[in-house]
Amino acid sequence: MLFRSSQMTREFYATVQNKMHYAVHGNTAAEVIVARADHNKEHMGLKSWKNAPDGKIVKTDVSIAKNYLGKEELAELNEIVTMYLDYATRQARRHIPMTMEDWKTKLDAFLRFNDVEVLQDKGKVTAAIAKEFAESEFEKYRVIQDSLYESDFDKLMNDMEKNDAIH
């Protein structure tokens, strides 16, 4: 029972995440990863990552859909998530019992109220396929990144060489 419950919870959160992403940019989380992860693009298409802006991109960065969103998309996603969480908090404060199925229905109504298109299915790309694709692109990008990367030590040595050339 616990496994089924946790599986149901994971599916619920994946559904909410995908509907929110779709409302903002017309793609599920997995679809945005597959559409934007590209080893030929600057920073592999990522707009943010754990060690941004000057640190290296690591494998775990590339399978996070939010990392591919621009500032405006990210702001809009955060805004719509915050509005929905505020609504959920208000429902809880009013002691209104809700099942996960109720929350899915309320989410669709909330998105329609906000005049955005509502995702009706699970999307065209699974999370597993998106992760595999992004990690494959990362393996190609890592070679490029390593050739361009300048460590702090390298920067220090280059600065010292420049200073020696000036003096």
Each model region followed by its residue ranges:
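Positively charged, phosphate-engaging catalytic surfaces used for nucleic-acid and nucleotide handling
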Residues: 1-167
